[in-house]
Amino acid sequence: MSNYKFETLQLHVGQEQPDPATDARAVPIYQTTSYVFRNSAHAADRFGLRDAGNIYGRLTNSTQDVLEKRIAALEGGSAALAVASGAAAIDYAIQALAGAGEHIVAQKTIYGGSFNLLAHTLPHYGIETTFVDAHNLEEIEAAIKPYTKAVYLETLGNPNSDIPNIDAISELAHKHGLPVVVDNTFGTPYLIRPFEHGADIVVHSATKFIGGHGTSLGGIIVDSGNFDWKASGRYPGISDPNPSYHGASFADVAGPAAFVTYIRAILLRDTGAAISPFNAFILLQGVETLSLRIDRHIENTKKVVEFLSNHPLVEKVNHPSLPEHPDHALYEKYFPNGGASIFTFNIKGGQKEAHKFIDNLEIFSLLANVADVKSLVIHPATTTHSQLTDEELADQNIYQNTIRLSIGTEHIDDIIADLEKGFAAIK
């Protein structure tokens, strides 16, 4: 179906024909833990990766399979793996590349949970990270060590929607034989496909825009199929005979799907962050309306940014569509159709004013999720990024008067009227 447009692919890939068992047009929920093999030889072929198909519910599920094929197609990748959460997807992608005594280079302005994983949790497993200004290619190159295993970016940083130059960074990373991992949660494949700009691996928190309704956790890892694991020689778990899978080389067995096959067969098998069939089904419902929702998110965001930019109680709006934003040129390059419905602004005052503004909103829900059809708000410095030191917060342009908004799909008049209530409370 590669010749079809995005809006068609999001509805059909993975289930081009009705369900063969029931003739159902909708994707069924295959609520099972395990699968019957035809005979002993068939079972051995499945476990030996000689025959593709279901083995056990921790590894694969037919509902999950449709979700994986659909997201892989939307991103332009070779294969995908769905897991229990976005956090699991990010962790698996990093651990598939780096082990004890090895190193990651990461954009410093990333989601607080990803920052904590890289800065505090993975060092316990011997994986160190150097955080860099993603706009400074010299700083990125200087951070690369002989034992660096990947460069990690976000298409739109969280919470300020800053934008890295994926093309330039990918070219630099590839010069050093390194894959580039890009979190495209906020970008979505509808607006930007990182593989077209040199990235090698894409990860998503499917909980966000892909699901779109704040109902189900899920994560996705997408393999571009472009990175040559064998030629690199730096990733023996993928390229060499793997002793934990009877000597199979995933690069040989799975070809362009080697990366996600390695994660499925080794990391997911051993640590079990499996997505449930029901969550995969719910996320598929979200995928079917992804383009429609994103268009409405963008339309509303443009009007909110304009409203905030002209409000006397706003100190600064951090949105890359604004000409004064340092990433405005990159925004026009990577997001010609708009984007960044999750962004921040700095209210005049400090934490007290920020909290009072938030506490007087009615339509906006105060919660930690983003990218819901409902409008959301939070105070990053005391919640999502509260584990960061004051210095780390300032380094990410997060202050006590910073408020993060996730603009939903409600009527724009109601969204702006609600923001006015917040401002009225601090006048």
Residues covered by each model-derived region:
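Active-site beta-loop-alpha junctions enriched in small/polar residues
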Residues: L156, T185-G187, L322, K348, ...
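Well-ordered beta-strand positions enriched in small/hydrophobic/aromatic, beta-favoring residues
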Residues: V151, G219-I221, V317, F343, ...
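Conserved small-domain helix->loop->beta segment predominantly found in fold-type I
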Residues: T271-A274, F278-A280, Q285-T289, I294-R296, ...
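PLP-dependent enzyme catalytic core of the Aspartate aminotransferase-like
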Residues: A119, P146, R293, D359, ...
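Conserved N-terminal alpha-helix of the aminotransferase class I/II PLP-enzyme fold
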Residues: N39-D91, G113-H120
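Conserved PLP-enzyme active-site core in the AAT-like
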Residues: S2, G14, P18, A80-N310
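Short hydrophobic/aromatic beta-strand micro-patches
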Residues: V222, T344-N346, S406-G408
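N-terminal "arm"/small-domain region of PLP-dependent enzymes with the aminotransferase-like
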Residues: S2-N61, K69-R70
